[in-house]
Amino acid sequence: VEEWIIRDEASILNQLGFKVSDFVEQRISDGTFKKNDLEFTKNSFVQKNIMTECENIYAKTYKDSIINLIEDKFSFEKKVYERSAQLYWFGGELINTVENIYEKWNLFLSCFKILKCEVSNSIALDQNNMRPRAALRWRLICLHNSNGFFGLPTNKEIEIYGISHAEFGKEGIVREFILIDEISIWKQLLL
């Protein structure tokens, strides 16, 4: 049995009134975060064998959607979300409507040149009286090469770890949860 235990530390920090980047800078200056921590972070992503009994059309659709969304940087030819979709974004943010969802993804991705996108785990479930749903664990290897959400470009190669959960309606995703380790991103940029 594999269990993913996670929490949105960026959301906790935001609720306490801290900026994530300031928190990481403080932890670097007090010696809590060290450069050798990065090697552990970068070696922690292991691709697992896909459990075929947990894979179905929704897992494949979601996996393809996320990869296309990230790699194609929003050539919106393929419809991924229903018009009234909701996105629960890392940091405790709730985004409503498909236009705002694409804008949020674009803002996040615009400061990176994506070098590699891979999914290590996918699982899906389709039960009576519930919306079909799927979950993914994924990683991006990218170059921080543009201004944006993560400040001025550092030209550092970083790894971004994420998990996603989606619920599907008749025309696409109706509700999605995205959790990204924002503290890890800032550590890689600032150390």
Explain the meaning of each model-derived region:
Residues 1-191:
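C-terminal and inter-domain tail/linker signature
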